[in-house]
Swiss-Prot record:
The keyword Cytoplasm does not apply. Keywords: Ribonucleoprotein, Ribosomal protein, RNA-binding, rRNA-binding. Binds directly to 16S ribosomal RNA. The lineage of its organism: Bacteria, Bacillati, Bacillota, Bacillota incertae sedis, Caldicellulosiruptorales. One of its GO terms (cellular component) is cytosol. One of its GO terms (biological process) is translation. GO terms for molecular function: small ribosomal subunit rRNA binding; structural constituent of ribosome. Belongs to the bacterial ribosomal protein bS20 family. The keyword NAD does not apply. This is Small ribosomal subunit protein bS20.
Amino acid sequence: MANTKSAKKKIKVIRRRTIENKIQKFKMKKAIKEVKKALLSGDIEKAKELYSKAAKLIDQTAAKGVIHKNNASRKKSRLMKLINKYAALSSPQPESKAQ
C-alpha cells in the first residue's frame, strides 16, 4: 500500500484512468461487433457505414494510448478485409467467356 500522500493520489489517478481506458476499449469492441453483425445479416451497405464509425473509434483508442497504433491498424485492416470478402460473395460474379 502507498505510504506517501502523492503515492495515494497516484493510485486514485491510475484507477480513474483504468476505468476510462476500459470504457474506450468497450466502445471500440462494440463498434467492431456491430459491423460484423451487419455483415452476418447480409447488409453490406450498413456494414460499410458502420465501418467508418468503428474506424474512427479505433483511431481514437489508439490516439489515447489504450491500444498500440499498429494494433489499431491491424484491426481496421482485418475489418475492411472481412467487409470486402462478404461484398465479393454477395455481388453476382460476371460470367467468364469459354474459349
